[in-house]
């Protein structure tokens, strides 16, 4: 992934790295591969394991005694109690690269990090694979220089419209792109029922699974359109308050991204309607 060099570079300066992003977007796979590459004996521990999670939540000091740095803590949002103890460790030792963490509930994580680890952690976000990663093209910094962009166009083979739509339908989850899962319909159906519905319940409690599935379908049908809570509420047969709450949840889980309009005026960027 194009982010690999960035993580290794930041690990030379920061004691903690927090990588957020949707589930199954490749966060853990990439960090475990980098752990082998750096060869520091970094331990891997996942808070998806309920026994491990219980210790992290109820006795974070003991957790860090057992799982000594350097350590990779997966799904750290399940135990925000760890952040205070990680802060104490960093303040006492300040060893670059001690803590690598991943999390799939973005805004929920940010609150805990901002309260406890402000200035001590490098925050990174990983989306599913970019088109450049999928085709194996080199990573280049973003630029608006037309000469550079035209040169890049010459390096990448053009594709026809059916191929573009096939890429859209396939999506960019590593499991699909790599061919690990051949049936994409089954993959995405299982993804919704296994991860999304479980995480939604974890965030908001009880949720009507059928209505929420209908809501996700309505949101997906409006990709690249202006966000319209009223229309989404009508399609899912819910009220607008619930529609707004569910949009927030999907954004928190990294399932959707809200693109706010560009404006030199910060206030206008805030109040104008974003696109999904």
Predicted regions and their residues:
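Hydrophobic anchor at the beta1->P-loop junction of P-loop NTPases
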Residues: 19
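Conserved lysine of the Walker
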Residues: 27
């Amino acid at each position: 992934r194009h982010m690999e060099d960035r993580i290794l570079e930041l690990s030379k300066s920061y004691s903690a790295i927090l990588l957020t992003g949707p589930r199954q977007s490749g966060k853990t796979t990439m960090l475990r591969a980098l752990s082998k590459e750096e060869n520091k004996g970094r331990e891997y521990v996942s808070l998806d394991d309920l026994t491990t999670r219980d210790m992290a939540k109820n006795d974070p000091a003991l957790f860090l005694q057992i799982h000594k740095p350097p350590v990779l803590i997966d799904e750290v949002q399940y135990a925000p109690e760890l952040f205070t103890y990680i802060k104490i460790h960093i303040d006492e030792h300040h060893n670059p690269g001690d803590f690598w963490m991943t999390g799939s509930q973005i805004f929920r994580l940010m609150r805990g990090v901002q309260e406890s680890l402000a200035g001590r952690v490098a925050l990174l976000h990983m989306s599913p694979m970019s088109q450049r990663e999928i085709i194996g093209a080199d990573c280049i910094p973003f630029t608006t220089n037309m000469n550079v962009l035209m040169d890049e166009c010459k390096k990448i083979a053009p594709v026809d419209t059916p191929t573009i739509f096939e890429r859209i339908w396939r999506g960019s989850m590593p499991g699909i792109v790599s061919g690990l899962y051949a049936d994409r319909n089954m993959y995405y159906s299982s993804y919704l029922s296994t991860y999304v519905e479980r995480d939604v319940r974890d965030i908001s409690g009880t949720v009507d699974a059928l209505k929420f599935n209908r809501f996700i379908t309505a949101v997906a049908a409006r990709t690249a359109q202006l966000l319209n809570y009223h229309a989404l509420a009508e399609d899912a047969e819910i009220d607008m308050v619930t529609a707004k709450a569910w949009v927030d949840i999907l954004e928190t889980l990294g399932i959707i991204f809200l693109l706010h309009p560009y404006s030199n005026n910060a206030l206008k960027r805030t109040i104008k309607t974003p696109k999904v």
